Curated annotation (Swiss-Prot):
S-S bonds: none
Family the entry assigns: Belongs to the glycosyltransferase 51 family.
Regions that span the bilayer: 12-31
Catalytic activity annotation: [GlcNAc-(1->4)-Mur2Ac(oyl-L-Ala-gamma-D-Glu-L-Lys-D-Ala-D-Ala)](n)-di-trans,octa-cis-undecaprenyl diphosphate + beta-D-GlcNAc-(1->4)-Mur2Ac(oyl-L-Ala-gamma-D-Glu-L-Lys-D-Ala-D-Ala)-di-trans,octa-cis-undecaprenyl diphosphate = [GlcNAc-(1->4)-Mur2Ac(oyl-L-Ala-gamma-D-Glu-L-Lys-D-Ala-D-Ala)](n+1)-di-trans,octa-cis-undecaprenyl diphosphate + di-trans,octa-cis-undecaprenyl diphosphate + H(+)
InterPro entries in UniProt: Glyco_trans_51, Lysozyme-like_dom_sf, PBP_transglycosylase, Pep_trsgly
Topology term for the membrane: Single-pass membrane protein
Gene that produces this protein: mtgA
Protein name as annotated: Biosynthetic peptidoglycan transglycosylase
This protein's UniProt keywords: Cell inner membrane, Cell membrane, Cell shape, Cell wall biogenesis/degradation, Glycosyltransferase, Membrane, Peptidoglycan synthesis, Transferase, Transmembrane, Transmembrane helix
Length: 240
C-alpha cells in the first residue's frame, strides 16, 4: 500500500514539475491571459455579492514608460538585475526586523511577486511559500530579466480590480502606460506595498513622501540608463 502511494505521489510530482516548466516556457513568449490573483479577486467579489469588472490591457515592453520600470525597481527591488530571484540580504534583514516584533516586513523580490501573482493563491502557508520558491526559480532560469519585469508590470494590482500598467495609468491619471511622467510613475510605485488601500492619484502624506524618496532613488540608480543593467550577466547564485 505504501509503495503504491509513493509511486503515485512520485508520478504526480513529475507531472506537476513537467507541467509547470512547460507553462513557464510558454509564458516566456506568450502574454499570460490572466493571473491567479485576478481569479481570486473575481471570486472574492462574487462571494461578497459585489461583482467587479477587472481592468487589464497587456502592453509590450516598448509601450510602457521607462520611468515606471525604473520607479518600480527603485521602490520594490533595487537588486533585481543582480539576484537570481531571492535577495538573501533583504531576507536576513526582514527576519531580524520581524524578531523584534511590531509590523511584519516582507522581502519579496519582483521575481517572487510575479510567481505568486501569476500562479498562486494569497496566504502565508509553507506550501504556498514552497511553490513560490519553485516558480521563482523557474522564471529566473527561463526568462530574461526584461521579461520578468514586463510580466510584472502587466500583472501587478494597482487598485481594486485594476491590473497592469496600462489600466493603472488610465485609471489614476487618464493617460496610457507609455505616457506616464516621472512623477506619476513614482506615485504608482509608491503604492505597491498596499495598492488597495493607498491611491496613486489621491496620495496620503506618507505616499507622497515615499514617491519623493523613489524619485531620489531613480536618480541615484542612473535613470533610464539603469535598464541597460538588465542585460548584464549575473554572478552564479552560490557566489552571491
Amino acid at each position: 500500500m505504501l509503495r503504491l502511494f509513493l509511486r503515485r505521489f512520485t508520478k504526480a510530482l513529475l507531472w506537476f514539475a513537467g507541467g509547470s516548466v512547460l507553462l513557464v516556457l510558454v509564458f516566456r513568449f506568450v502574454p499570460p491571459p490572466g493571473t491567479a490573483l485576478m481569479v481570486e479577486r473575481k471570486i472574492e467579489s462574487w462571494v461578497d455579492g459585489e461583482p467587479i469588472d477587472l481592468q487589464r490591457t497587456w502592453k509590450p515592453w516598448d509601450e510602457i514608460s521607462d520611468d515606471l520600470k525604473v520607479a518600480v525597481i527603485a521602490g520594490e527591488d533595487q537588486k533585481f538585475p543582480e539576484h537570481w530571484g531571492f535577495d538573501l540580504s533583504a531576507i536576513k534583514a526582514a527576519l531580524a526586523h520581524n524578531e523584534l516584533g511590531g509590523s511584519i516586513r516582507g522581502a519579496s523580490t519582483l521575481s517572487q511577486q510575479v510567481s505568486k501573482n501569476l500562479f498562486l493563491w494569497s496566504g502565508r502557508s509553507y506550501l504556498r511559500k514552497g511553490l513560490e520558491a519553485w516558480f521563482t526559480a523557474l522564471i529566473e532560469v527561463f526568462w530574461p530579466k526584461q521579461r520578468i519585469l514586463e510580466v510584472y508590470l502587466n500583472s501587478v494590482e494597482w487598485d481594486d480590480g485594476v491590473f497592469g500598467a496600462e489600466a493603472a495609468a488610465r485609471h489614476h491619471f487618464g493617460v496610457g502606460a507609455r505616457s506616464l511622467s516621472r512623477q506619476q510613475a513614482s506615485y504608482l510605485a509608491a503604492v505597491l506595498p498596499n495598492p488597495r488601500v493607498w491611491s496613486a492619484s489621491h496620495p496620503t502624506a506618507y505616499v507622497s513622501r515615499r514617491a519623493g524618496w523613489i524619485r531620489q532613488q531613480m536618480s541615484q540608480l542612473g535613470g533610464d540608463s539603469y535598464l541597460l543593467t538588465l542585460n548584464d550577466s549575473r554572478r552564479a547564485p552560490w557566489a552571491q
